[in-house]
Amino acid sequence: ISLNRSLSDYVSGGNLLEGQFTAEAIDILVQSPSFSGSRYCQNGTLVDGFIFLFPGTEVNALSIHESFWGHQYWMQWNGSTNNYRAYQSGGYSFNAYAFLAQKEDGKPSNINQMGIFAHEFSHVMGLSDLYGSDQNGNLVPGPTPWDVMTQGMYNSSGRKPPKYSGFERESMGWITLTEFSANEEIY
């Protein structure tokens, strides 16, 4: 879908109006005859997760406002509602989403890197970052480059993110890890 306004129209008084941007996009989406929200709901009417691709590159969007960068967030907190609940439209509820640039920085003719998509959508699915910062604000990279939830999202300039780690697969309920004791032989 396309909105009828430019990104710069969603900035007012220095504030990003992300809630307005996302709500307007959802309202247009649910009116489309091709939209079938039930395809995206595991239970009931809550759409399990979705992605907003804003036009152009992240660098260009950041020149409009410092918050136009790839991230994951929730409709209940972004200003789209006044009651801190999921946004309602077309009989469906919308909450967790990723917000990404459509085009690649430095190569605007290319679609954005898969690594950033995989990282941010993994947040929508419930995974957390595996990097942080120390008390001085310095990056603590985590298991980079072997993990998409840390710096692995940038492998091969973001084109080849790693597979999910055992920790992430277990966190999602996809596998059960076996804990070994010190006296067990491992083959």
Give the predicted meaning of each segment.
Residues G49, P55-Y187:
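Extracellular hydrolytic enzyme modules, especially secreted metalloproteases
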